């Protein structure tokens, strides 16, 4: 792969992140609604939140993926976090998700001391499930009819990694 860099998401990245989430396959894997505007993405990413760490994956300076790690801020759950990830359709299966996951887990383990990370993933997203399992995530349960996507309800697994 060419030069792949994971770094903090900056305001100049917002348009490119919008393009990531505008990719049909990337969008289908999220709980977002298609056709979100660049302004909506900009507002979401620019909202400063305690415990939120937005990252981007760049290949030769071009944003091709995005991950946001968020710490649960309740005093009783601050040992836990969750994340969402998306990779542009034309970069899926090329190591971008793996690199984002490695950066996420480094941040969670070595800087934030999180002992639990969890996520939701649609049950039909086999490549994502395989990626998460590769990093030690296990399925803890399934939310039935979790989201409405493309005219039908879909289930989602809750996956978590404990350390």
Give the predicted meaning of each segment.
Residues 109-120:
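Conserved GNAT acetyl-CoA-binding A-motif
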Residues 94, 98-99, 110, 123-141:
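Conserved active-site alpha-helix within GNAT-family acetyltransferase domains
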Residues 118-121, 133, 138-154:
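Conserved catalytic-core motifs of GNAT/GCN5-like acyltransferases
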Residues 19-33:
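Helix-loop element at the rim of GNAT/NAT acetyltransferase active sites that forms part
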Residues 152-163:
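Terminal substrate-recognition subdomain of acyl/acetyltransferases
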Residues 4-19:
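A short beta-loop-alpha structural element at the N-terminal edge
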Residues 8-11, 30-90, 101-103, 107, ...:
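Acetyl-CoA-dependent GNAT
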